[in-house]
Every structure is written in C-alpha cells, then in structure tokens.
C-alpha cells in the first residue's frame, strides 16, 4: 500500500525565448517605430495608470496599495483586509488570504469593453520579427513538413484540392479530387488515405453526432461532400493508443448541382447545416437517423431559408422551365438582385445562433431551434456605416466602399462577453465587434459596439514624441490622438479568410512583407516580386492581460512571426486558457497559467504545419531575469514575486535562473525595488513604525504586507484554484444492475501526483528559507505589533498552510495506492448500511479540498477515523506497525501524532493476540495486556468506532472481565476531572461544554453494558450443575461473577448510576436488589422522586433490609405522589405502609412511627371516601357521559383534598352519606349543617320510589333507612356531632305515623347494628318519653323491646333483675321501669 515519497517533479520547462539585445528597462517603449527613428524609443502619451476601472463590489473588499521604494516605480497590488490577524488560527488566516485573492482573480475586468479603446487602440507594435523581445506574445515551437508522399499525391490533382485541420483528432486533412488524406500531426510519418469515394470531394467537416444516435465510442462524424452526394462517416479515436477508425454508415444525401461550399454543426443538438455555391444564400440542414420507414429515409436534407412553396417543388424542375431562374429568385425572396452566395458559416455554440457571411459581405444571423432557423438579422455595409457614425468613427479609408470587404466572421462566446455576439474581420485588418440580444424566439438587432483598427506607420510617427515611463508625466503632448491616425492609414493588412480570433481576443492573420521595407503590402501583383521581394509572415495581436488586470487599461502586444508559406488555416490546438466561465476573470492568464495547458496554435501552410505557443508570464519574467523592471512596470511587484517564486522552484531550470529568481524574491532589486511590509503612514524610505497599528477588533488596516507575501499567496491560490472549492470524495447511488454504491476520489491519481509534487517543492523551499521570511511570530492576541511582525504572522500562516496541503494530498495519494480497498472501505463506513449515520455521511461527502487543507476539529476527527481503518486493514494483512508509523509521519504528519503511534502499536499487539489464541493462550494474554496498556495511554485519541472494534476483539478472546476493567479506566482517562458528573449535577444543560465528556463516558459505558448483557444471556442459557443438592458454578456463572465483581469494585458514582439506569431501562431492575454496593440505596432514593418503578424498588429494598419505617415512609409518599397510579394502588400502598408501621419494633423510632401512622390513617380515610365516590360516579346515570368519564378519571388518580371531593362531587351529586363521612374525617362540628344533611338524607329516602311495586311504602323506607344508618353509624358513631343519635331517633320515630306500622325493635335494632350501645339508647328513649318528644307511644314500644334485648345480651343485667320483671313487661311505664334502679345503683354513665 505504501510507497516512497514522490521524488520526480513535474517539468513545466519550455523552450527559452531569446530576448533581443536591445531589451532593457524600456519594455513599454516598444511602440511602432520606423527606420528613420534610429532605434530611439517611440513613447505613448497615455499612462496605463490613467484609467483604472474596478468593480464596486471588489473595491469594497480590496484596496490599492503601493509597494515600491523609488517614486518613479508604482506597483498596483492587492491589500487584503483580514480581520483578527493576530487572533485568528494560522490555517484559517492563510485560508482567508487564499480565498480573498481567489475572489480577486475571478473578478478581473472584462476583456472587450468599448471604453478601453473608444479613442483608439494602444499597441505595443514592431514590424520586425520578434521586435517586442520578451513581450512577444507567441513563439514558434515546431515546424513539421507535410510528407513528400502526401504532397506528391496533391500535385497530381486534376479538379480540386483543399486542406485543413481536424482539431479534435490532431489530424490534418488534405483532399485531392476524390481522395481524402488524414495526416497525423503528432506523427508526421503516419497518414491515412481514403480513396473509395467515387466523385470529387468539395468539402469535408468533422462534427459532433446527434445525442443518443450512435454508440458511445462514436464521438465524431466525418461529413464528406462531393459533386453528387454528402456522405456521413463515423470516426472513433482512441486518445491513449491514437488509433483511428473510420466506418461507412451507408448514410448519404443527394446534392447534385449544389456545389457544397460550407458545412458546420450545432454541437448541443447535433444539427448539421450546409450551403452550396450554386444555391444563393440558402441554408440547408442535413438530417439523419438510425431507423427507416415507409415515409422517411434514414437521411435527407431540408432547406431552412426558402419559402414553403419553393421547398416543396423539385430542386431541378424550376430552373429548367422558361423564366425559371426568375421564378426561383422570387420564391427565395431575392428577386432583382445579383447572384449572392454564402462564403462562410459560423455557429455561436453558447447561444445557439448561426451566422452566415455572403460574397457581398452581408452577415445574416439566425436563431437555431429544433424546427430549423428563425431570422435572419442582417449586417451589411450600410448598417456598419450607420454604426460607425454613431461611434464617431467616420471617413476611414480602411472602411470605404471601395476597400470594404469582410474576410471572416468569428462568434464570441457568452463566457467571454455577455453582450458581444460577433467579431467581423475586414480584408483591411479592421475588427468590428457587434453586440446583440436574444430571446427564446428570436434574435434582437445586432449593433456595432466597437472598432479596432490595425496599427499603422502614421500612428507610429505621431506618437514617437510622446515618450513616458510609467509613473512619469508625458514630456511632450500632441493634439492628434491615435484613433485619427489609425483610421486614416493608407497602409493596411491584406487579410484573408484564414484570419481568425482565438479566445480570449487573440487576433491572427497572414501578411506579405517586402524584403527591403518595413511597410506592409496591400497585395501582390507580380509572381517574380513575390518570389524575390516578398515573404509570408504571421501577424498576431494579443491583449496584454496583465496590464488589463492591474490597471484596467487595454493594450495589445502586436508582432510579426516567421512562417514558411502561404497560410491555409489557423486553429487552436489546445483549449482556451480562460480562468473562469464568466466575463469577469475570463482573460486572467496570470491565474490560469498553472492550471490550464499553455495555448498552442496550429498554422497550416501549403507545405508544413507550424505550431506556435503562447508565452506565459513566467517565460516573460525568465527572459527578463537580469532586469525585471519592465515586468514590474506592467504587472506589479506581487505578480513579479509570484513568478519569481515559481521560477525558483521550477524543475529543470538552470542554477543561474533559480538563484536570480530567489535573489529577487528575497530582496527585490537593491537600491531600486525593495520588498518589505510597510505602514500606510510611512512616506519615502522611513523605517517601519513600532506604534500600535491595530484597532480594537484586531484588524490591521494600517499595515500593508509585502509583495513577497502576496506573491507567495497568489502562487498557492492559483496552483489549487481548480480544486479549492471542489468536493474531495464522490458518491454515486447504485443502479438496479449494480451491486453496490460507487465511491471514489474526485480527482485522478495523476492530478494528485501533480499537485503533490508541486506543493512538495514549495514546502521544501519554505522550510529551507523560512528564517529569511519569518523572524518573530508574536503571541496570539497581541495588539502592539510592527509591520514586520504582521508579515511574520501572515507568512508563518502561509507556510503552515503549504505543509497542511502537502499532508492532505499525501493522504489522498495513500488512498490511491490501493484504491479498490479504499472504495470498499468507504462503502463499509459510508454506505447505506455503514457504520456512520446519514448526517456524518452527508458531511463527509460535502468535504471540499479547502476543508481538507485547513481542517477543523470535526474534519480531522473524521479523516483520522478513516485512516485508522486503513491502518488496521494493513496491520491485519501483516504490515509492521512501526513501518506504518514511519510512513505516516513522513507523508502527512498533521494527521499522525504520537498518540496515534501508540494506537497503531496497540493494534499490532491486538492482532498478535488473535493469532496466538489457538497456539499459545499465555502469549495471547500477554499481547492483550500490552495492547490494553497502550490503549489506555492514548485513550484521549481513540475514537468510538476504533474502541468498539478493539472491545469486540477482546470479547471474542473471552477477555470480558479485564475488558470491563479496561473500559472503566478508559472512561476515567478521557474525563479526568469527572466533568460528566458535574454536567449531570448542573441539570444537563445542552449548552454546557461538559456535555462532551458526558457523551464520551456514556459511549464507553454502553460498551460495558453490552458485555454485561452478553454474559447474562450466556448464563441464562447454561444451567449450573449440582451434585447432592450442592450447586456447582459453571464456566458461564463464574464468568458472570467475575464481571460483576469488577463492576462492583468501581468507586465511580456516575458509572454506578449509569449502570443502574441501564438495568432499569432493560427491565432488569430486580438485579438491583441483589447487588452488594454502597451506591444502590442512594441511587434508589434519588431516582425514586421521578420514577414509579424505582420507588417500588426502593420500598422493597428497604423492606428487604428491614428498614420498616423508611419503607413505610416511601409507600406513604408513593400513595400521595403525582405518579400515574390508580386509586386502588394508592390504597394498597397505604395498607402496606400501615402494616410496616405495625411491624416496626424500634423504640428510637417510636415518635416518628406514631406520626407516620397517623398520617397514613388520615390519608387512608380520605382515600376510602374517594374510592366510594369513584364507585358511585361509575354507576351514575344523572350526569353527562363525557363529564362522568372526566370525573371518573379524576377520582381514579391521586388522593384529592376533602374540599375537592365535597365541592366537586359529593355535594353537587347529593351523596349525603359521603358528605357525612367527609364531615367526620374533617372534624366538622356545625350541628345545624350536619342535621340539615341528615334531614335531606331522610327525606330523599322517603321520597325514593320503592324498588318493589307490591311492597308497603313504610317498610321500604324502614329498610332503606336501616341500611343507610348502619353504614354511616359504623364509621361515624364515635362522633356525636356527625352521628346525632338523639336527633336521628326522634326523626325516625316521627316518620312512623302509625305505631302499628313498625315492628317491635325495628328502630332500636338499626342503631344497635350501627354500633350504638343499649345504655345510650335507653337514656335517649327515656328522655324522649319523659319530655314527650315526638312519637312517644312508639318510643315506649321501642323501650320495651330495648330492655328485653338488653336483658338477653347483658349477663350483668340478668344478675341484677329477676326474670319475672322482664317477662311481665308489656307496656313501658317510667314508674315501673325494671332497669331504672339498676342504672342508678351502678351509676352507669352514658357509653
């Protein structure tokens, strides 16, 4: 899996450009000059600093700062305002610099803005080859002659030959009559000849196929147009093997008489358009498909611009009839005009617009739709003249009626400019830019937006007296601006259709130059003159992107380059080096030079292929290494430092170049340019001030960091700009046919190696030269620091970022070393059923490269966990832990610490323990003990997933007791201050920072509980054997005992409480009653307040320990608690509590016991009343059903206050018996109120309907009142106020109107059954009879029955009175009362 660190660096080396001998510090003086100037510089009067245009949103964040020593030098660089320079974390600080510089790079000015050159275009121009020296935009890199065999075949052409370049294939094509020759650009000896085509080839074109038409390997179609047919061939090209295969699809369309002249396609839809040299300005579409039916063939053609009638008539029919040509012109909407044909087709692939150029220099623009073309919008000479008048550009001989002719049209992509649609190149070298608008249904009018005239010798002579150096005022001025001289030039470039504009904005054309003159020729009229005095040159004019970026000034570097012969075609071989896909930042070549391949342009001549390469800024700087002032003048010190750093680290450069670049990067140009941080308050060369330059927020607006720092940050920014915001890992859901989800890394391994090698070189460079750039880093949070201190802080942060990037890329490279295993691991960890939850998976796959380069704690943790899994897999495969540790430390130290090393070694011992388990258990145990010791030492760095894996292995090795002990110690290690206990004690606030420690402990304890559960389950399965009724411990029981012994020996209160909580949660609360631990009782007492289950356990635990008073107290509290208990259960608790009170024999607890007993009885009485109420309400029919259920629910819960029972239930529902019981329990003593309740009770019984229709009403009443009186009397008879016997006796006696209606003793018997004594009844009846109260006769009758019943039940009375006295008692008379003397003699009082 592991390999040695990457040693080979990426070679960016290019062929060194040879600067002209005259090149010095006058780079901006290289203006057009003539031979009479004697080599003196021709200077412009317009400063690059005069007009700086920057977006407002960029200006809000960035300021302009100067970082030069000499007043005549000025550098426009970026001063990034970062808040909290001294308080930010270094990686975060460096990341902010990178992100802000990247923002600046993405927002450089738009390339083509008419304000740039409304008064003429500024050129750096020389009419000599290589006259611009180091600033020549292109250099010829390669010349490949067309093979002689190919030229020989072309020389035999009889009818027509043509040539061009297939950019997509890197092949040149050459036609000769009916032969098509494909010549490999990369291998000049390889070519293919297709000679099976029957007729002369007129045009060939490579196009993209329609989507979903051919197999995926077919990426291009070769369209071959002959005199009679258009053939559609497929081409498959293998980029790796460069194998080219051409297949005949059998698709062809008849085009007899068309003379096809142009073919082009719209890549988005695959539509193919073509025109014919004999078909006027019509545009046709070539249609094809893979199916054929009765009405449609596989391929056909349709005219998109003719009228519908003309499209229906046969093509050959109309011209053949008399006057047919005139009819055809009328149908085509072009009657009365001369013959006009299409000379060029151009498609704007970004907007879906087709432009056509006709032989009369008329441009027609159509909107491409699925049904054809919409339009056209026309651009003709009159339209252009009106546009030029509006722009103030009049009377230019280059655009006169005689000279005006369009040579080429070039579309401009939306990515390059939102407004500009089209560039038109005239034969005089003028470039016209048109802007427009577009909707879904049509194109708006195209208006002339700007004009670029070519450089002229006249403008050169006018400008030669306007010399200046950037930062100086012009020495002389002239009233005539460059626009007037450029548009009035009498010399011009003879532009052909081979001219082009390559994005971004690079203009190429071919010129013919006289051998003895510096002027450009209009044309060639004599062949001998061409051979002897003229030569072909390549004219190139490229925008100076650096000046545009830094100064908002548009300048073009224009030069002539050598070429071999007449130019046939100019095409780019590589993609554009645009930095963004938006107009802002699009043309920032400084930002894209490290991420985009240098632009290469292929120029095809009649006998060779020439390749020209764009000179990147580092190549320009290298050419100026001895005197970089011109580079600094144009592009600024920050760019110069960035480029110098790049050259100092570049592979395969000479020591001279590297040392010179390093010298400039370190010290600038001594005495001329200094590179150091400075205060904005400094002036001249005053040393940095030492006062506090920071405000209270920590921002250092008063300090401008050095160009060296910004140059270094720019290089880092641009090296990783393409991946900085990209996701690191990719994830794709499995389709129905795939077995598992697809995981991987978003960049390829070659990309990883490229980035890693680049950053490694930078890391090595800064590690070596760090003391030169970082002096003293002030402590974090410092306020009073100097500019030098601020520079050290920023540079130190950047160096840390470089090393962090290196470590991150090394990590990814390690993953790539066994990518299949890594993908499988990701599926295990991050898959649908993986270890991590959905939030973690989402976070992981949202990780971007800048998150990995500047990782926060969560990112580090996640990557570390994955890395541990990778390491474990390698250890399992037999790799040494020491070797792994060394590799990890060497490659990415920030992801591998000393604690990680201990973890890896512990993992190695754990792996060894598994291997020796079956061989030697003693050795296995030794390895296990060592692993446990190592894991404990690095406990704070072990993640839960890794800990779980370790525990699983230990359990498999039957090491449960020591595993539990290890986990207990592990928990103490990760929470040394027992912060988890503090977190719980403070109320478990989720915002409490101690929650982290709580969660960690809980996770560890969960692993212990899982072990306990497995041991318990195993024990329950295995029955313990017994011999002679003596139990013998089985292995499972012994294991369980040892595990529980380790648990009970723990002195951590928090662990015990968590363990008991787990037992209760898993319905194992009975275990608590069997545990011998000092923490059980405190736990039960604390948890009982909030848990019914624990409360039950608590009283039972106390009862088991014979703490009866405390158990009764718990039961009493439980009965009166707010727990969800039914009333019957509360009554049961009270009954149990009362029984426990009676069981207690402790003398010391007697007072507390008496008090508790009284409380229990009081609550029990109330609960009994509530229970009776509950039963009554359940059967109540007088109230609403919903209210009855609500009242029942209320009563069948906690014991309610007597007032609630009375007011809410007993009184509204007239439960008189309940009310009387409430009076008794509440000790209510208002006789009037109580007697009133008795009256209402008795009245209710009188008025109650008899349940037996046939019974006598008096008997029913007597039975009812007897039952009621007995029930009430049993509970209230000891309270005379609540159970007034005298009052009740009178009321009952009065209720019997007829004394014969009542059986003897019917009244007294009910009182006796209610618990009233005979003596008390005797006194009450005597008083009634004596005072003649109420029904005296019935009272006397009841007295007779009472005395007899008393005599029978009282032995003492029988011994005092003769039986005859009782027998002869028939009617009561106070004078003959047999009991009167007995009562008086015995001095009986009322009982």
Swiss-Prot record:
<dbReference type="GO" id="GO:0003677">
    <property type="term" value="F:DNA binding"/>
</dbReference>
<dbReference type="InterPro" id="IPR042533">
    <property type="entry name" value="Nucleoporin_Nup155_C_1"/>
</dbReference>
<dbReference type="GO" id="GO:0006405">
    <property type="term" value="P:RNA export from nucleus"/>
</dbReference>
<keyword id="KW-0906">Nuclear pore complex</keyword>
<keyword id="KW-0509">mRNA transport</keyword>
<keyword id="KW-0813">Transport</keyword>
<dbReference type="InterPro" id="IPR014908">
    <property type="entry name" value="Nucleoporin_Nup133/Nup155_N"/>
</dbReference>
<keyword id="KW-0811">Translocation</keyword>
<dbReference type="GO" id="GO:0051028">
    <property type="term" value="P:mRNA transport"/>
</dbReference>
<keyword id="KW-0597">Phosphoprotein</keyword>
<feature type="modified residue" description="Phosphoserine">
    <location>
        <position position="1034"/>
    </location>
</feature>
<dbReference type="GO" id="GO:0006913">
    <property type="term" value="P:nucleocytoplasmic transport"/>
</dbReference>
<keyword id="KW-0007">Acetylation</keyword>
<dbReference type="GO" id="GO:0036228">
    <property type="term" value="P:protein localization to nuclear inner membrane"/>
</dbReference>
<feature type="compositionally biased region" description="Polar residues">
    <location>
        <begin position="38"/>
        <end position="48"/>
    </location>
</feature>
<dbReference type="GO" id="GO:0005635">
    <property type="term" value="C:nuclear envelope"/>
</dbReference>
<dbReference type="GO" id="GO:0044611">
    <property type="term" value="C:nuclear pore inner ring"/>
</dbReference>
<feature type="modified residue" description="N-acetylmethionine">
    <location>
        <position position="1"/>
    </location>
</feature>
<comment type="similarity">
    <text>Belongs to the non-repetitive/WGA-negative nucleoporin family.</text>
</comment>
<dbReference type="GO" id="GO:0000972">
    <property type="term" value="P:transcription-dependent tethering of RNA polymerase II gene DNA at nuclear periphery"/>
</dbReference>
<dbReference type="GO" id="GO:0051292">
    <property type="term" value="P:nuclear pore complex assembly"/>
</dbReference>
<dbReference type="InterPro" id="IPR004870">
    <property type="entry name" value="Nucleoporin_Nup155"/>
</dbReference>
<comment type="function">
    <text>Functions as a component of the nuclear pore complex (NPC). NPC components, collectively referred to as nucleoporins (NUPs), can play the role of both NPC structural components and of docking or interaction partners for transiently associated nuclear transport factors.</text>
</comment>
<dbReference type="InterPro" id="IPR042537">
    <property type="entry name" value="Nucleoporin_Nup155_C_2"/>
</dbReference>
<dbReference type="InterPro" id="IPR007187">
    <property type="entry name" value="Nucleoporin_Nup133/Nup155_C"/>
</dbReference>
<keyword id="KW-0472">Membrane</keyword>
<dbReference type="GO" id="GO:0006606">
    <property type="term" value="P:protein import into nucleus"/>
</dbReference>
<dbReference type="GO" id="GO:0017056">
    <property type="term" value="F:structural constituent of nuclear pore"/>
</dbReference>
<comment type="subunit">
    <text>Component of the nuclear pore complex (NPC). NPC constitutes the exclusive means of nucleocytoplasmic transport. NPCs allow the passive diffusion of ions and small molecules and the active, nuclear transport receptor-mediated bidirectional transport of macromolecules such as proteins, RNAs, ribonucleoparticles (RNPs), and ribosomal subunits across the nuclear envelope. Due to its 8-fold rotational symmetry, all subunits are present with 8 copies or multiples thereof. NUP157 may be part of a NPC subcomplex containing NUP53, NUP170, and NUP59. In addition it may bind to MAD2.</text>
</comment>
<dbReference type="GO" id="GO:0000973">
    <property type="term" value="P:post-transcriptional tethering of RNA polymerase II gene DNA at nuclear periphery"/>
</dbReference>
<dbReference type="GO" id="GO:0003723">
    <property type="term" value="F:RNA binding"/>
</dbReference>
<dbReference type="Pfam" id="PF08801">
    <property type="entry name" value="Nucleoporin_N"/>
</dbReference>
<dbReference type="GO" id="GO:0031965">
    <property type="term" value="C:nuclear membrane"/>
</dbReference>
<dbReference type="GO" id="GO:0005643">
    <property type="term" value="C:nuclear pore"/>
</dbReference>
<dbReference type="Pfam" id="PF03177">
    <property type="entry name" value="Nucleoporin_C"/>
</dbReference>
<protein>
    <recommendedName>
        <fullName>Nucleoporin NUP157</fullName>
    </recommendedName>
</protein>
<feature type="region of interest" description="Disordered">
    <location>
        <begin position="1372"/>
        <end position="1391"/>
    </location>
</feature>
<keyword id="KW-0653">Protein transport</keyword>
<keyword id="KW-0539">Nucleus</keyword>
<feature type="region of interest" description="Disordered">
    <location>
        <begin position="21"/>
        <end position="50"/>
    </location>
</feature>
């Amino acid at each position: 899996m592991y390999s040695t660190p990457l040693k080979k660096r990426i070679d960016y080396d290019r062929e060194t450009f040879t600067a002209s001998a005259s090149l010095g510090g006058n780079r901006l003086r290289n203006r057009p000059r003539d031979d009479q100037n004697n080599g003196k510089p021709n200077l412009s009067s317009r400063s690059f600093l005069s007009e700086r245009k920057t977006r407002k949103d960029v200006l809000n964040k960035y300021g302009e700062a100067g970082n030069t020593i000499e007043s005549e030098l000025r550098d426009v660089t970026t001063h990034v305002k970062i808040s909290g320079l001294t308080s930010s974390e270094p990686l975060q600080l460096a990341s902010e610099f990178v992100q802000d510089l990247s923002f600046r790079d993405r927002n450089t000015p738009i390339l083509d803005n008419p304000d740039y050159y409304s008064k003429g275009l500024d050129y750096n121009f020389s009419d000599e080859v290589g006259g611009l020296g180091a600033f020549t935009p292109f250099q010829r890199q390669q010349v490949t002659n067309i093979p002689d065999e190919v030229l020989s075949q072309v020389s035999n052409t009889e009818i027509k030959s043509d040539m061009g370049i297939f950019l997509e294939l890197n092949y040149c094509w050459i036609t000769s009559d009916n032969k098509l020759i494909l010549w490999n650009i990369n291998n000049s000896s390889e070519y293919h000849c297709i000679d099976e085509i029957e007729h002369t080839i007129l045009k060939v074109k490579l196009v993209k196929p329609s989507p979903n038409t051919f197999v995926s390997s077919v990426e291009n179609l070769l369209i071959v147009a002959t005199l009679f047919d258009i053939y559609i061939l497929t081409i498959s090209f293998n980029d790796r093997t460069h194998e080219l295969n051409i297949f005949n699809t059998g698709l062809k369309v008849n085009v007899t008489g068309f003379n096809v002249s142009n073919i082009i396609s719209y890549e988005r839809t695959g539509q193919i358009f073509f025109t014919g040299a004999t078909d006027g300005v019509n545009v046709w579409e070539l249609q094809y498909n893979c199916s054929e039916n009765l009405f449609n063939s596989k391929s056909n053609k349709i005219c998109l611009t003719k009228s519908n009638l003309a499209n229906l008539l046969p093509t050959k029919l109309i011209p053949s009839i008399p006057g047919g040509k005139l009819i055809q012109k009328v149908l085509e909407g072009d009657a009365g005009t001369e013959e006009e044909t299409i000379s060029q087709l151009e498609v704007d692939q970004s907007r879906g617009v087709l432009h056509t150029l006709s032989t009369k220099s008329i441009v027609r623009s159509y909107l491409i739709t699925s049904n054809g073309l919409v339009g056209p919008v026309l651009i003709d000479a009159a339209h252009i003249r009106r546009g030029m008048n509006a722009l103030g550009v009049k009377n230019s001989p280059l655009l006169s009626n005689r000279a005006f002719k369009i040579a080429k049209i070039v579309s401009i992509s939306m990515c390059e400019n939102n407004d500009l649609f089209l560039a038109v190149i005239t034969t005089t070298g003028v470039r016209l830019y048109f802007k427009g608008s577009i909707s879904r249904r049509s194109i708006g009018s195209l208006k002339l937006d700007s004009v670029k005239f070519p450089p002229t010798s006249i403008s050169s002579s006018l400008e030669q007296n306007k010399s200046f150096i950037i930062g100086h005022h012009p020495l002389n001025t002239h009233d005539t601006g460059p626009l007037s001289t450029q548009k009035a030039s009498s010399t011009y470039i003879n532009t052909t259709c081979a001219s082009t504009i390559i994005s971004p904005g690079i203009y190429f054309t071919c010129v013919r130059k006289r051998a003895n003159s510096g002027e450009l020729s209009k044309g060639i009229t004599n062949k001998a003159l061409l051979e002897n005095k003229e030569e072909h040159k390549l004219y190139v004019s490229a925008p100076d992107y650096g000046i545009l970026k830094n100064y908002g000034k548009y300048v073009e570097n224009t030069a002539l380059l050598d070429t071999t012969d007449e130019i046939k075609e100019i095409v780019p071989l590589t993609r554009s080096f645009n930095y963004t896909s938006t107009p802002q930042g699009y043309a920032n070549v400084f930002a894209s030079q490290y991420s985009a391949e240098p632009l290469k342009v292929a120029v095809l001549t009649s006998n060779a292929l020439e390749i020209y390469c764009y000179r990147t800024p580092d190549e320009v700087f290298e050419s100026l290494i001895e005197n970089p002032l011109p580079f600094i003048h144009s592009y600024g010190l920050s760019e110069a430092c960035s480029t110098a750093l790049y050259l100092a680290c570049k592979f395969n450069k000479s020591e001279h170049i590297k040392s010179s670049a390093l010298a400039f990067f370190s010290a600038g140009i001594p005495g001329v340019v200094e590179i150091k941080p400075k205060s904005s308050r400094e002036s001249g060369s005053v040393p940095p001030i030492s006062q506090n330059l920071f405000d209270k927020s920590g921002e250092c607006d008063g300090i401008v960091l050095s160009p060296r720092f910004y140059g270094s940050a720019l290089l880092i920014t641009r090296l990783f700009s393409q991946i900085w915001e990209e996701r690191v890992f990719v994830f794709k859901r499995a389709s129905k046919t795939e077995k598992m989800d697809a995981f991987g890394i978003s960049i390829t391994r070659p990309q990883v190696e490229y980035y890693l090698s680049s950053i490694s070189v930078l890391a090595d460079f800064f590690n070596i030269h760090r003391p030169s750039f970082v002096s003293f880093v002030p402590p974090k949070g410092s306020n009073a620091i100097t500019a030098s201190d601020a520079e050290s802080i920023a540079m130190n942060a950047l160096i840390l970022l470089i090393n962090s990037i290196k470590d991150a890329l090394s990590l990814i490279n390690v993953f790539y070393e066994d990518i299949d295993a890594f993908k499988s691991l990701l599926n295990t960890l991050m898959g649908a059923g993986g270890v991590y939850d959905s939030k973690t998976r989402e976070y992981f796959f949202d990780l971007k490269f800048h998150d990995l380069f500047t990782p926060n704690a969560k990112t580090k943790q996640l990557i570390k966990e994955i890395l541990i899994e990778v390491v474990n897999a390698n250890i399992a495969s037999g790799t040494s832990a020491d070797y792994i540790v060394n590799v990890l430390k060497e490659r990415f130290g920030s992801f591998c610490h000393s604690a990680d090393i201990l973890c890896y070694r512990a993992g190695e011992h754990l792996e060894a323990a598994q291997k020796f388990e079956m061989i030697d258990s003693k050795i296995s145990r030794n390895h296990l003990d060592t692993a446990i010791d190592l894991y404990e030492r690095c406990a704070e760095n072990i993640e839960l997933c890794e800990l779980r894996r370790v525990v699983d292995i230990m359990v498999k090795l039957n090491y449960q007791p020591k595993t539990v002990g290890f986990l207990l110690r592990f928990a103490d290690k990760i929470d040394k201050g027992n912060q988890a206990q503090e977190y719980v004690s403070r109320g478990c606030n989720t915002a409490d920072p101690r929650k982290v420690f709580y969660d960690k402990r809980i996770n560890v304890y969960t692993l212990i509980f899982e072990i306990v559960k497995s041991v318990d389950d195993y024990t329950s399965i295995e029955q313990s054997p017994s011999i002679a009724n003596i139990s013998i411990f089985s292995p499972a029981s012994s294991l369980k005992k040892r595990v529980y012994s380790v648990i009970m020996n723990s002195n951590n209160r928090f662990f015990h409480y968590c363990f008991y909580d787990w037992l209760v949660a898993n319905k194992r609360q009975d275990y608590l009653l069997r545990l011998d631990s000092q923490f059980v009782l405190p736990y039960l007492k604390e948890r009982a307040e909030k848990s019914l289950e624990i409360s039950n356990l608590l009283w039972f635990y106390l009862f088991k320990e014979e703490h009866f008073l405390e158990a009764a107290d718990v039961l009493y509290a439980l009965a009166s608690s707010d727990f969800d208990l039914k009333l019957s259960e509360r009554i049961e608790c009270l009954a149990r509590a009362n029984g426990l009170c009676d069981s207690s024999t402790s003398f010391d607890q007697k007072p507390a016991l008496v008090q508790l007993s009284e409380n229990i009885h009081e609550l029990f009485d109330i609960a009994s009343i509530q229970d009776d109420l509950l039963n009554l309400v359940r059967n109540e029919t007088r109230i609403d059903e919903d209210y009855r259920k609500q009242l029942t629910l209320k009563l069948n819960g906690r014991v309610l206050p007597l007032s609630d029972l009375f007011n809410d239930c007993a009184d509204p529902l007239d439960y008189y018996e309940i009310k009387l019981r409430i009076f008794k329990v509440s000790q209510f003593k208002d006789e009037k109120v109580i007697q009133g309740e008795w009256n209402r009770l008795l009245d209710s019984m009188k008025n109650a309907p008899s349940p037996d229709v046939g019974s006598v009403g008096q008997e029913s009443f007597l039975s009812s009142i007897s039952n009621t009186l007995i029930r009430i009397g049993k509970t209230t008879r000891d309270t005379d106020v609540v159970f007034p016997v005298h009052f009740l006796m009178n009321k009952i006696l009065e209720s019997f109107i007829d004394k014969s209606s009542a059986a003897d003793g019917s009244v007294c018997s009910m009182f006796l059954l209610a618990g009233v004594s005979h003596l008390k009844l005797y006194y009450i009846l005597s008083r009634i009879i004596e005072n003649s109260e109420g029904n005296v006769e019935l009272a006397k009758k009841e007295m007779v029955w009472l005395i007899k019943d008393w005599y029978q039940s009282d032995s003492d009375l029988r011994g005092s009175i003769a039986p005859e006295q009782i027998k002869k008692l028939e009617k009561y008379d106070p004078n003959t009362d047999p009991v009167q003397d007995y009562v008086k003699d015995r001095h009986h009082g009322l009982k």
